[in-house]
């Protein structure tokens, strides 16, 4: 790339300080920061180099770049990681059709949008995992651990460590697939302890018949709110809408991914959702108190967090 071509008015280049050493730093910074391409600040897009100079807290205009001249590639990466908390976003596809799944493609499009804004993303296909049915034993309430030993434990750790989630399911008789429902049923202590508090979710649904995806989206929105997550947005499309609708859905999904990353970075507050989340939090706290002698782990969890 030509560093001069990327810097606009008011930048170091336009101020006449883009000398040869600085060019080297710009190129070095670029190579350390490909994951941050198209990062936006105040709704404005910048080049890789401009983003990195912002992220490591060096003013763009009329500054001495001498401190950077001694930094190695690894040092710059270390500075970037220290200054910017990388977002982790997990996509969960509940369609059993693998690479043929339209739902999977839309989930991936959301993840691509988030990735373009600096997020680290991962896509999981539920159909590839062995997740058994919940047997309502109540062990998770008592100990915080599930009695079952399968792939759910690994997936659950990823869910809890993620900053954002992208949930995708096709319409199966006016609801999510069996794979999605089985996973949700294994998350009972998640709702009691509101363990997705502070996270953001995008829900994606597809259907054959016109409008049938709406029920699926409504269901997933309600579930994720009950778990404590904000809903950044949702997207649905049906086969009856035609090929053009699918193409448009892909574009919308990418934009939703960008918005999801922005929400996480800015810690966006949705006022109406916040009211629901506060109500849910109080409701489940009271429920846990009522069964404190049986739901030992959950009571201890809320005690540890001062019931906040």
Label each region the model flagged.
Residues 15, 61-62:
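Cysteine-centered motifs
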Residues 20, 31-35, 63, 72-73:
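Short, low-complexity intrinsically disordered segments enriched in A/P/G/S/L with frequent Arg
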Residues 76-169, 174-182, 188-189, 251-261, ...:
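N-terminal beta1-alpha1-beta2 submodule of the flavodoxin-like/Rossmannoid cofactor-binding fold
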Residues 27, 46-50, 73:
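Low-complexity, intrinsically disordered or signal/transmembrane-proximal segments
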Residues 196-235:
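Short, glycine-/small-residue-rich phosphate/pyrophosphate-handling segment
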Residues 1-12:
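Extreme N-terminal basic, low-complexity initiation segments
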């Amino acid at each position: 790339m030509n560093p001069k071509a990327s810097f606009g008015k008011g930048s170091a280049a336009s101020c006449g300080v883009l000398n040869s050493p600085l060019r080297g730093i710009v190129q070095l910074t670029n190579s350390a920061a490909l994951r941050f391409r198209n990062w936006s600040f105040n709704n404005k897009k910048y080049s890789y180099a401009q983003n990195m100079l912002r992220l490591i807290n060096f003013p763009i205009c009329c500054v001495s770049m001498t401190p950077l001249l001694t930094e190695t590639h690894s040092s710059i990466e270390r500075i970037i990681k220290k200054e910017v908390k990388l977002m982790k976003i997990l996509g969960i596809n509940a369609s059993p059709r693998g690479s043929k799944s339209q739902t999977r493609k839309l989930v991936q499009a959301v993840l691509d949008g988030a990735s373009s804004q600096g997020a680290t993303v991962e896509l999981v296909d539920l159909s590839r995992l062995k997740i058994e049915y919940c047997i309502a034993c109540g062990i998770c309430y008592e100990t915080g651990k599930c009695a079952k030993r399968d792939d759910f434990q690994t997936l659950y750790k990823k869910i809890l460590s993620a900053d954002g989630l992208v949930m995708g399911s096709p319409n199966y008789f006016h609801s999510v697939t069996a794979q999605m429902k089985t996973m949700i049923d294994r998350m009972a202590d998640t709702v009691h302890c509101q363990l997705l508090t502070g996270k953001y979710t995008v829900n994606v649904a597809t259907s054959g018949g016109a409008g049938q995806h709406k029920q699926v989206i409504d269901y997933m929105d309600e579930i994720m709110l009950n778990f404590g997550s904000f809903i950044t947005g949702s997207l649905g499309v049906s086969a009856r809408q035609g090929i053009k609708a699918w193409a448009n859905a892909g574009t919308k999904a990418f934009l939703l991914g960008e918005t999801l990353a922005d929400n996480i970075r800015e810690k966006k507050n949705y006022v109406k959702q916040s009211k629901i989340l506060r109500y849910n939090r109080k409701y489940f706290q009271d429920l846990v108190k009522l069964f404190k002698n049986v739901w030992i782990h959950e009571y201890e969890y809320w005690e540890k967090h001062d019931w906040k």
